[in-house]
């Protein structure tokens, strides 16, 4: 089976990005490894099962990269955070100070609201109307 394991998100600062994604969005810090060049390999994940797509938080190194922080998709929603309990996660994120750009709405495809991360990248918080048809990750504890 093939899957997208990581997506790179260029950030201003490793530690402030880790704080936002773990504290405000409830992600887990999967890896934070120093590299010989002084950079770090930092991965956060929205799930604890290790089967989702992680975010590689890459600190901007030059002006070109700094210019992309917060605008990696040209102002479009570029990231989609699925939930199985929209009201719970919306309330938790609101309490954590996440900036929502609109009121929650109910569409034919599910409950959705656009929010932005600490740098301004746009995300959808989405509870699909129809459960995800993809098979669930294997239950490794049953082996």
Ranges and model annotations:
Residues 1-6, 28-82, 88-118, 126-143:
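Vicinal oxygen chelate
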Residues 8, 22, 83:
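Ser/Thr-centric signal marking residues that sit
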Residues 11-14, 35-37:
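Conserved beta-strand-loop-alpha-helix junction that forms the acyl-donor binding cleft
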Residues 13, 117-120:
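Conserved phosphate-binding and hydrolysis motifs of nucleotide-dependent enzymes
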Residues 17-22, 93, 120:
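Conserved active-site tyrosine of GNAT-family acetyltransferases
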Residues 13-14, 84-86:
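Helix N-cap motif at beta-to-alpha junctions
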């Amino acid at each position: 089976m093939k899957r997208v394991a990581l997506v790179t998100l260029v950030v201003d600062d490793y530690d402030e990005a880790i704080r936002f994604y773990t504290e405000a969005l409830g992600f887990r810090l999967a890896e934070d490894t120093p590299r010989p060049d002084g950079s770090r390999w930092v991965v956060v994940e929205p799930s604890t099962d290790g089967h989702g797509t992680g975010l590689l938080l890459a600190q901007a190194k030059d002006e070109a990269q700094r210019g992309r922080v917060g605008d990696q998709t040209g102002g479009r929603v570029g990231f989609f955070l699925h939930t199985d309990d929209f009201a719970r996660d919306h309330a938790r994120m609101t309490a954590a100070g996440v900036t929502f750009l609109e009121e929650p709405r109910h569409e034919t495809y599910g409950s959705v609201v656009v929010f932005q991360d600490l740098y301004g990248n746009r995300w959808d918080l989405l509870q699909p109307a129809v459960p995800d048809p993809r098979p669930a990750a294997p239950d490794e504890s049953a082996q």
